Amino acid sequence: FLFVGDL
């Protein structure tokens, strides 16, 4: 998880 869309 680095970004919101990386979930």
UniProtKB/Swiss-Prot annotation:
It comes from the Eukaryota. It catalyses: a phosphate monoester + H2O = an alcohol + phosphate. Keywords: Glycoprotein, Hydrolase, Secreted. Transmembrane segments: none annotated. It is found in: Secreted. Glycosylated. GO terms for cellular component: extracellular region. Its EC number is 3.1.3.2. GO terms for molecular function: acid phosphatase activity. Belongs to the metallophosphoesterase superfamily. Purple acid phosphatase family. Monomer. In L.esculentum there are at least two isozymes of purple acid phosphatase. This is Purple acid phosphatase isozyme LeSAP2.
